[in-house]
Amino acid sequence: MTARIVSTFGVAGLLRLKSFSGEYAHLATLKQVCLAPPRSRSSGTLACALPREAVHMVEHVLLRAQDALLKLHRVDTVECARTFVGAELRVPRAEACPLSAGEFYLADLCRCELVFEGSAVGVVLSVVEGGGSSLLEVQRTHGGVCYVPFHRTFIGDVDVGRKKIELLQRWILE
């Protein structure tokens, strides 16, 4: 996931994007994008009308100070554009925002093993937007799903290469 369509803009079918990384420059050269309904059941209050994931051709992207405007081919009215609000914009990793040393994409946390004091206690299913921090949706080893704030109070070392995330406070799984 690179961005989310948060609203329409104007009457000509423009879509306002909010980048998950906060970076927008890499969006300017996109020729096509994959748009999909939000992955997680808990991805916020935006209701996306897209029935399934699909590839769309990009006419242009206008970068602004705090967001970007996306114009898709054949999306020429605000009514048509509204069906995309809430959708997630996905691009090939090569076209995503470049990472600095020690950084990772939130999507890389999915399927990582959550480990407490050397023992596996769960697997990350998805990353959900939360108020103060993102939340890891975790399938607990002994059953059930819970949410763990992705915050230094609860999360220690993250090794996406080994697919391991250190949990610092076990009680948060209860």
UniProtKB/Swiss-Prot annotation:
It comes from the Bacteria. InterPro entries: PRC_barrel-like_sf, PRC_RimM, RimM, RimM_N, RimM_N_sf, Transl_B-barrel_sf. GO terms for molecular function: ribosome binding. Its main location: cytoplasm. Keywords: Chaperone, Cytoplasm, Ribosome biogenesis, rRNA processing. Residues 101-174 form the PRC barrel domain. It is found in: Cytoplasm. Pfam families: PRC_RimM, RimM. GO terms for biological process: ribosomal small subunit biogenesis; rRNA processing. One of its GO terms (cellular component) is ribosome. PANTHER family: RIBOSOME MATURATION FACTOR RIMM (PTHR33692:SF1). Belongs to the RimM family. An accessory protein needed during the final step in the assembly of 30S ribosomal subunit, possibly for assembly of the head region. Essential for efficient processing of 16S rRNA. May be needed both before and after RbfA during the maturation of 16S rRNA. It has affinity for free ribosomal 30S subunits but not for 70S ribosomes. Binds ribosomal protein uS19. The PRC barrel domain binds ribosomal protein uS19. This is Ribosome maturation factor RimM.
